[in-house]
A protein has these predicted regions:
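Extracellular glycosylation-rich, acidic/polar low-complexity regions of adhesion-
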Residues: 1-32
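Polar, enzyme-active/binding microenvironments
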Residues: 25-222
Length: 222
């Protein structure tokens, strides 16, 4: 994968280690800080104590998280975009239950217009259609899934045009690359063992991933 040359690891002590593969000895550490006033307690409003994957809609006014207690994707509205301290839980009636597909939902992501939702759980990624964009309560399972090659699939991200899906493999310590011949359509997905990045030397049990805007850097949370 192109992004394999550039990786970043978020460490438990709150530092970010970025490694540029073009300069193998070049590693920088940057301290990550946050304001305690910007913390939002999911369990207090939704009863969910085992939060996993997170995602936003395209303008930051809605936030979603996958919860292992209810096996559901829950929806929150933010009065200030991307400010979680302004989040309001929309209630259990506005969630998407995924129990029939997985009992451990982890990573979640949307397609480019919010009409599709993807949920990683156990060894698969599952695809759902939303009749109203970014409204998970309108979601229905497409009866389409794809085996990721890892029995504990966590964070998932698409590239910018939806022709590649990347999966953090918690058990295998790999980042799997999945190719889609039709953008955002899991039924057209294929995977090769050669198209994976092992992060075992840097990040045991990777939980989530993110790219920079042009896909030249990959960041891994473990």
């Amino acid at each position: 994968p192109v992004a394999a040359d550039n990786t970043g690891i978020v460490n438990e002590d709150g530092t970010l280690t970025v490694s540029d593969g073009a300069s193998a000895n070049s590693i920088t550490n940057a301290e990550i800080t946050y304001d305690a006033n910007d913390v939002f307690d999911m369990s207090a409003v939704s009863g969910e104590t085992r939060s996993a994957g997170f995602a936003f809609n395209n303008d930051g006014t809605k936030m979603y998280h996958a919860g292992n207690d209810d096996n559901a994707v829950k929806e929150y509205h933010l009065s200030t975009a991307y400010d979680v301290s302004t989040a309001t839980y929309q209630g259990d009636s506005e969630q998407l239950t995924v129990t029939s597909q997985t009992n451990e939902p982890f990573g979640i992501t949307f397609n480019n217009d919010g009409s599709k939702l993807y949920v990683a759980g156990n060894s698969n990624v599952y695809q759902y259609s939303l009749s109203t964009a970014y409204d998970v309560s309108t979601g229905s399972y497409d009866s389409v899934s794809f085996a990721t090659g890892d029995n504990t699939s966590c964070g998932i991200r698409f590239n910018n045009d939806g022709t590649k899906l990347f999966v953090a493999g918690f058990a295998s310590h790999n980042i799997e690359e999945i190719s889609l011949s039709t953008a955002y359509d899991l039924s057209t997905a294929s995977r090769s063992d050669s198209d994976r990045l092992s992060v075992s030397a840097q990040a045991q049990k990777p939980r989530d991933i993110e790219f920079n805007i042009d896909g030249t850097r990959l960041f891994v949370v473990s």
